[in-house]
């Protein structure tokens, strides 16, 4: 019987975590992920003469299984499996499977590697006969394990992984989904880590694009290479071992920095060693020449300026940075002013705190668009669109996480420049920014603070419900106007004469009867009936679509169509937040429906 994706992933994690022993998660991940990679490429490409990945004879997963229990298993894996596989495919910095300092020595090492191989003999991981659309399962398993390792790795060691939800936001706001992409379309991440951000951008494109990534840590660059292959991007070009700032490895034929259509990045926050190996005042790539030199101990703008320089004249980019870049003074204020004046900054998105592995500080996404900049002759930038998404998240263990509805709302509002809710987002004109001395701190422009409860002293002393408090619920009275009159009536003056006390209302039903009065009121009952009928109509249409597509479908495409349809279905319905309805479907998909669809597909 086929195993569900969720069960497969949790089983993999539980087994791997059990075998880890005292090894640091940041080290153990290399062994687990390499093992998963060997299993995947062996199933998919072994014996294929023209495959994009070469599996040397004697270097497949089956050959690794044959080494189980042998006293020299670690040395043999290095020599017969990992070495030839890495050499044939130019994979860098693979882990040492015969390292006693990490895996133990003697029988301990033999048992640990034997058991680790056994985990990946799971029949559910046999993808040699799977259809193409099923390949996502191993790629997703790789990302699942990386996310858990990032959580376990602690401060600074989890930075190889950008949370998938944040990556999705960045991939969508740069507009690659709407663009006419081809194989010549280029996407670059100068600090690519494990490559998850690059892959999310590639997944949004309508056609296959060409991916480039540089990562200073060679072991992490190796993870990125494997991640590309597992997600069916074997031709992605990943280079490692050098700092992007000191030694950028992607150069054009003219000797200058290679430029790209899209650039995305999640660089190390406030990198204090950004200038190591680099003379910023004499930068051969002229990244700081027209903007200013970043502070010696704050490398945030160094990475952002590298992105600007690496974009084509029509290029678009997005970079995750700490909020300090928006308001810090001195050299950074000069750089910020120059970037704004050139029209490069399209938008700022404030994210919730504690989203990222390795740090709890809040961050923002700085969105770059060269196409509408002054420098390139298209001076159409009238302002900067600012969005405060800091309150939209859910607790997930010891971290915060963006929900599907949070991601969708951010992308919708940003893409449409929707400023109907000024507490969430607004277009800030350049004149206003200039008036604030080019300070981009989001709270200066968006007041996202919760309104304090107004204390009505007269109401406290003399009784009565302030009419303003009742009117604040106008959305409900628009739907049920007579319900308001059923619940409230003008407050009489009492012993102070005939008439009514202006501005105050009286509750006409007992407090314990409020809920039943609302539920039994004909207007509310009618509203509930209409909403139930509205949902039932959508459910019937969705059921017909599911039965029609059951013969051949891709689960991810299916849920995308269904969820987008549901979102539009509730777009204009009163009292119901369409994003809340959307989240209910996405939760159901994640918990139940996704597994069933992958079993059927």
Label every PLM stretch briefly.
Residues 156-265, 270-291, 301-302, 321-324, ...:
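Conserved S-adenosyl-L-methionine
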Residues 365, 369-411:
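Conserved P-loop NTPase
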Residues 7, 11-14, 18, 27-37, ...:
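Conserved Class I SAM-dependent methyltransferase catalytic core
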Residues 106, 131, 213-217, 262, ...:
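Hydrophobic alpha-helical scaffolding
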Residues 1-178, 239-249, 350-353, 381-388, ...:
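Non-catalytic, mostly N-terminal accessory regions of nucleic-acid modification and defense proteins
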Residues 272-277, 318-319, 328-333, 348-349, ...:
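Extended hydrophobic-aromatic, low-complexity segments
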Residues 494-497:
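Glycine-biased, low-complexity coil/linker segments
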């Amino acid at each position: 019987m086929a195993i569900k994706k969720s069960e497969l992933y949790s089983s993999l994690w539980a087994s791997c975590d059990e075998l880890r022993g005292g090894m640091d998660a940041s080290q153990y991940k290399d062994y687990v992920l390499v093992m998963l990679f060997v299993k995947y490429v062996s199933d998919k490409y072994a014996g294929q003469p023209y495959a994009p990945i070469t599996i040397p004879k004697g270097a497949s997963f089956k050959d690794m299984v044959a080494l189980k229990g042998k006293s020299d298993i670690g040395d043999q894996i290095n020599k017969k499996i990992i070495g030839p596989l890495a050499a044939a495919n130019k994979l860098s910095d693979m882990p040492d499977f015969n390292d006693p300092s990490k895996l133990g020595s003697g029988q301990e090492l033999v048992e640990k590697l034997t058991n680790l191989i056994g985990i990946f003999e799971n029949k559910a991981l046999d993808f040699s006969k799977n259809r193409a659309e099923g390949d996502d399962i191993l790629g997703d398993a790789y990302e699942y394990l990386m996310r858990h390792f990032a959580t376990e790795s602690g401060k600074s060691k989890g930075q190889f992984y950008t949370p998938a939800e944040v990556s999705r936001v960045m991939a969508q706001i740069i507009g690659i989904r709407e663009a006419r992409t081809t194989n010549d379309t280029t996407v670059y991440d100068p600090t690519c880590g494990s490559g998850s951000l690059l892959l999310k951008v590639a997944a949004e494109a309508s056609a296959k694009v060409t991916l480039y990534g540089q990562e200073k840590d060679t072991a992490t660059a190796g993870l990125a290479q494997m991640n590309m292959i597992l997600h069916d991007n074997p031709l992605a070009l990943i280079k490692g071992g050098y700092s992007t700032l000191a030694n950028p490895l992607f150069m054009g034929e003219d000797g200058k920095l290679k430029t790209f259509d899209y650039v995305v990045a999640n660089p190390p926050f406030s990198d204090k060693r950004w200038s190591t190996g680099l003379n910023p005042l004499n930068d051969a790539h002229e990244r700081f020449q027209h903007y200013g030199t970043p502070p010696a101990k704050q490398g945030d703008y160094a990475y952002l300026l590298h992105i600007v320089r690496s974009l084509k004249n029509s290029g678009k980019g997005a970079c995750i940075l700490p909020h300090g870049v928006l308001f810090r003074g001195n050299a950074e204020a000069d750089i910020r002013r120059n970037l704004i004046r050139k029209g490069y900054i399209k938008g700022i998105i404030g994210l919730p705190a504690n989203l990222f592995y390795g740090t709890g500080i809040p961050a923002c996404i700085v969105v770059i668009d060269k196409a509408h900049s002054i420098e390139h002759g298209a001076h159409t930038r009238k302002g900067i669109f600012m969005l405060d998404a800091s309150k939209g998240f859910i607790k997930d263990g010891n971290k915060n996480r963006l929900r599907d509805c949070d991601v969708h709302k951010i992308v919708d509002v940003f893409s449409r420049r929707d400023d109907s809710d000024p507490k969430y987002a607004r277009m800030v004109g350049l004149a206003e920014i200039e008036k604030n001395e080019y300070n981009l701190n989001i709270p200066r422009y968006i007041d996202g603070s919760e309104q304090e409860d107004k204390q009505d002293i007269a109401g406290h002393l003399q009784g009565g419900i302030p009419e303003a408090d009742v009117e604040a619920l106008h959305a409900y009275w628009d739907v049920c106007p007579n319900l308001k009159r059923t619940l409230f009536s003008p407050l009489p003056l009492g012993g102070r004469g005939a008439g009514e006390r202006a501005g105050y209302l009286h509750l006409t039903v007992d407090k314990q009867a409020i809920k039943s009065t609302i539920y039994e009121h004909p207007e509310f009952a009618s509203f509930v009936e209409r909403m139930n009928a509205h949902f039932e109509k959508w459910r019937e249409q969705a059921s017909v679509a599911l039965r029609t597509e059951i013969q051949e479908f891709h689960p991810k495409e299916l849920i995308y169509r269904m969820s987008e349809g549901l979102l539009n279905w509730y777009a204009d319905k009163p009292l119901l937040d369409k994003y809340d309805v959307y989240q209910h479907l996405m939760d159901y998909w994640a918990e139940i429906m996704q597994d069933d669809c992958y079993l059927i597909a």
